[in-house]
């Protein structure tokens, strides 16, 4: 018998046993076993097989396993006690979550956020919200000199605090999350910082010969959210 199931999900199969003669039927009072006489078999890195008295095998794969699993041999006997065996082979198809990149844009000096979208590969294997998101190196904070600092929250939201002098497209970071099987998905977040450039209007003054004069140029912020810094003296 064979069966196919999704990654991380139980599957079952039941080999068919046929009497050698109708006069000597299979003995339903004698439980089926594996060839070693046991009813449970665990294969490291693959999963656990359990056989029911009627010969039905349940296979529970470990969350990370995909592909064709090793076969197990099921043994039954007829009313004469004559044994017969048949193999059961399960196959596990991969379930792969995906990530969709995200961008953000704001003015120079302002904090930005972005949250990549992660989608489960199959509804039966949702994203694991109990496992915090990280960057691809396993960290949750990344500082890029001359650019700024990125921090990722457990839900995958990235906060970018740019250095005051930085403008343009940021390097970005890769966010990693996992599904309930522990399968990873990644997606990039990239911020863009729009320059804010203040302007100045010249000033003029007129006075009589030998007398002191004053004038004050007008300085205008490039954006109302980034006012002129009155704590820094003019030079």
Stretch-by-stretch model annotation:
Residues 14, 33-36, 53-54, 115-117, ...:
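Polar/charged alpha-helical tracts
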Residues 1-28, 71, 79-129, 172, ...:
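Extracellular interdomain linkers/hinges and stalk-like, low-complexity segments
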Residues 39-86, 140-187:
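Acidic, turn/loop-rich segments in luminal/extracellular domains of secretory-pathway
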Residues 27-41, 45, 127-147, 231-235:
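A surface/secretory-pathway sequence property marking extracellular, secreted
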């Amino acid at each position: 018998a064979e069966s196919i199931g999704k990654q991380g999900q139980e599957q079952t199969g039941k080999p068919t046993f046929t009497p050698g003669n109708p006069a000597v039927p299979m003995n339903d009072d004698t439980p089926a076993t594996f060839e070693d006489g046991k009813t449970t078999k665990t294969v490291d890195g693959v999963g656990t097989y359990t056989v029911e008295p009627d010969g039905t095998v349940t296979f529970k794969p470990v969350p990370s396993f995909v592909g064709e699993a090793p076969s197990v041999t099921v043994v039954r006997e007829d009313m004469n006690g004559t044994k017969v065996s048949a193999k059961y082979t399960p196959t596990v198809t991969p379930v792969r979550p995906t990530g969709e990149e995200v961008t953000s844009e704001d003015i120079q000096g302002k904090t930005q956020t972005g949250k990549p979208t992660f989608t489960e590969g199959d509804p039966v294997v949702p994203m694991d919200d109990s496992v915090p998101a990280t960057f691809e190196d396993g960290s949750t904070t990344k500082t890029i000199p001359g650019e700024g600092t990125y921090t990722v929250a457990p839900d995958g939201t990235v906060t970018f605090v740019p250095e005051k002098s930085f403008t343009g497209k940021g390097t970005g970071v890769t966010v990693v999350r996992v599904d309930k099987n522990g399968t990873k998905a990644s997606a990039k977040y990239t911020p863009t910082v729009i320059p804010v450039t203040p302007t100045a209007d010249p000033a003029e003054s007129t006075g009589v010969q030998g007398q002191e004069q004053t004038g004050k140029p007008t300085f205008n912020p490039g954006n109302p959210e980034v006012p002129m810094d009155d704590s820094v003296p003019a030079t």
